[in-house]
Structures are given as structure tokens and as C-alpha cells.
Design a protein with these regions (language model features):
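Sec/Tat signal peptide C-region and signal peptidase I cleavage site
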Residues: 16-22
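Primary mode marks residue(s) on the alpha4-beta5-alpha5 output face of response regulator receiver
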Residues: 22-196
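Positively charged n-region of N-terminal signal peptides that target proteins for export
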Residues: 1-4
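Bacterial N-terminal signal peptides
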Residues: 6-16
Length: 196
């Protein structure tokens, strides 16, 4: 009886739950917005990963350029985030996505990846760039393929194992200046935030 009641309630609510999820934008809209963090010269040739109508991460466009862009996740309805990174970072980035999809969270994602880098399972580039735009959902107009000036830009140059001593860049954030985040780790990178 209880099982029948649960099944009946779920069946009755399923259409409402599905309708409550934000629709997944068409591929062309996802692509147009995903490449916005990049300088214009890199946009047309970037590979773009985005979401199928079923919500699965797929390759929306297989580009010939050096950059890979990740479209905004439609499951994150209140937030907006797109990022583009050099293709040499894909093994590291893909592993992070796989770990999160399997339920690994927080610092554990990096601890697993760091061990795998040290074991030679993930190869890190000598240096690689990442460009991103973030904000709340109001900063993007998917249909128009635009973001508002309220979208926050972030620029990163990955330099695995870099430290203040090896780079001449401080580890503490400084307004208007670069700093090294995660110094001494495989994920070490120079942060450039246009405004803090």
C-alpha cells in the first residue's frame, strides 16, 4: 500500500518537477555565450562543451583552435558561469568533472587529481590560460548571446608547481595585481581579476 502511494504521488508530481527545471538553451545559444570570455580572435575556432536536451554534457562544437569552452550549466539556475581553457588542460578539467559527477566534493577533488598528476596519470601543461565570466543568472541574456557589464571576468594562467619564489608573484591577493593561487601544487595558477 505504501509503495503504491509513493508511486502514485511521484507519477502525479513528475510533470510538475520536470516543468520546474529551466529549459536547456539551444546549442547555438550555448555556443555563443560560452565563447564570450575569450578574446575575439579565439572564439570562432574554440571547441565548446555544453548540454544536450537531456542535460548531458556533450561536445556542441568540435573546434580547430587551442581553446575549449564550457557552457553555463543549466542546472545552476541562480548562477551563471562560463569558462574557456587551453586544450592542454582538458585531462585535468575532465577528471574534475568526472569526480564531481561521481559524488566527490570539495578538496577531495583536488587531492585525487594531485595524486594522479604526481603518479603520471594526468599530464599537466607547462603553462595554460583560462578565461571565465561569472555572476548571478541576471547577467546573461542567452537568446541575445550577451552578458551585462555586471558579469565578473577572471583570467588565469596555470603554471603547475609555481610559487612566489619561482615566479616573483605573491601568494596573497592584491587589488589590481596578479597573485599565485594554490602555490607549489599541480593546480598552481596566476590569478588576474580585473576588479575585486
Amino acid at each position: 500500500m505504501r509503495r503504491t502511494l509513493v508511486l502514485t504521488v511521484f507519477t502525479a508530481l513528475a510533470p510538475a518537477l520536470l516543468a520546474a527545471q529551466a529549459p536547456i538553451p539551444p546549442a547555438d545559444q550555448q555556443i555563443a555565450v560560452a565563447v564570450l570570455p575569450l578574446p575575439a580572435e579565439f572564439r570562432a575556432d574554440a571547441t565548446v562543451l555544453g548540454y544536450s536536451p537531456e542535460g548531458k554534457l556533450v561536445t556542441l562544437r568540435d573546434g580547430k583552435g587551442a581553446m575549449t569552452c564550457l557552457a553555463d550549466d543549466p542546472k545552476e539556475e541562480k548562477a551563471f558561469h562560463v569558462a574557456c581553457y587551453h586544450k592542454s588542460m582538458e585531462p585535468f578539467m575532465a577528471r574534475g568533472r568526472a569526480l564531481r559527477a561521481s559524488g566527490v566534493t570539495g578538496d577531495k577533488v583536488d587531492s585525487v587529481r594531485f595524486k594522479e598528476v604526481k603518479a603520471g596519470k594526468i599530464r599537466m601543461p607547462k603553462q595554460a590560460a583560462l578565461w571565465s565570466l561569472s555572476g548571478d543568472a541576471s547577467v546573461v541574456d542567452m537568446a541575445a548571446g550577451k552578458v551585462t557589464p555586471a558579469a565578473r571576468a577572471l583570467y588565469v594562467v596555470y603554471m603547475p608547481y609555481a610559487t612566489p619564489a619561482t615566479s616573483g608573484i605573491p601568494a596573497a591577493p592584491v587589488r589590481g595585481a596578479p597573485w599565485v593561487m594554490y602555490p607549489g601544487t599541480p593546480k598552481a595558477h596566476i590569478m588576474f581579476v580585473p576588479s575585486m
